[in-house]
């Protein structure tokens, strides 16, 4: 069996993270994971990258966790993927996978894009988009009980390790009977963990295309 983390933050990109990508990878290997997606906060979230930078420089710096992590990932036979976590208003966020940093680099208009545009562009390159931790109730989130429009995205992060149980339970209760992909992710920001959420598969995932295909075909089990 192979286990993959779908929600990981690192110090290179997220202001709230404390561990570097190399150390995060080593810890995931230690607990038996086969791979992870780097999903640092982008410019409408808690990023540590200056939003005033020219687009090319912004993307270069934002992508450092992924580019820096590939060497150690290769050495440890760990499958590392690029992704994002981005805000779409009122403190709410989405996760996206299935593309390389060049996807962002070639689309400077995404600096001011709304959720619909993001979804259209992600789907145009065969990517996957999901609501992150729906129904999370925090001071910075406006109207946490609002049910998001599921028709825009491919799935939801139904199990988030950083959520309260009641928040995850509501996500499963609301969306469990919908035709949407339900994933799991840890939302970890440091190496201070000895277990993690994710997906478990019977096959190894080696490419963006395989990751998206696995998710869309629901060819996995959530791992908690």
Each PLM stretch: what is its role?
Residues 2-4, 35, 128:
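Structural motif
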Residues 10-11, 34-47:
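Ser/Thr-glycine-rich phosphate-binding loops at phosphate-binding pockets of nucleotides
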Residues 18, 59-63, 205:
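Short, conserved loop/turn and helix-capping segments at secondary-structure boundaries
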Residues 37, 81, 130, 181-183:
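Structural detector of well-ordered beta-strand residues that form the stable sheet scaffold
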Residues 42-157, 162-163, 214-216, 220:
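Extended substrate/RNA-proximal surfaces in nucleic-acid metabolism proteins
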């Amino acid at each position: 069996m192979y286990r993959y983390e779908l929600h990981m933050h690192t110090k290179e990109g997220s202001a709230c993270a404390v561990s570097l990508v190399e150390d995060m990878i080593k810890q995931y290997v230690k607990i038996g994971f086969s791979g992870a997606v780097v999903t640092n906060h982008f410019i409408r979230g808690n990023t540590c990258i200056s939003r005033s930078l020219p687009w090319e420089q912004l993307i270069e710096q934002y992508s450092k966790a992924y580019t820096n992590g590939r060497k150690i990932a290769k050495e440890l036979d760990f499958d590392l993927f690029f992704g994002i976590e981005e805000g779409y208003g009122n403190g709410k966020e989405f996760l996206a996978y299935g593309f390389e940093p060049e996807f962002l680099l070639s689309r400077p208009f995404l600096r001011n894009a709304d959720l619909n545009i993001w979804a259209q562009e992600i789907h145009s390159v065969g990517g996957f988009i999901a609501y992150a931790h729906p129904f999370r109730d925090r001071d910075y989130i406006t109207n946490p009980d609002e049910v998001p429009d599921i028709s825009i995205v491919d799935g939801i992060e139904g199990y988030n390790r950083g959520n309260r149980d009641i928040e995850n339970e509501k996500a499963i209760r609301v969306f469990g009977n919908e035709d949407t992909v339900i994933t799991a992710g840890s939302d970890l920001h440091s190496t201070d963990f000895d277990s993690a959420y994710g997906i478990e598969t019977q096959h190894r995932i080696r490419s963006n295309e395989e990751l998206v295909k696995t998710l869309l075909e629901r060819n996995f089990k959530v791992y908690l």
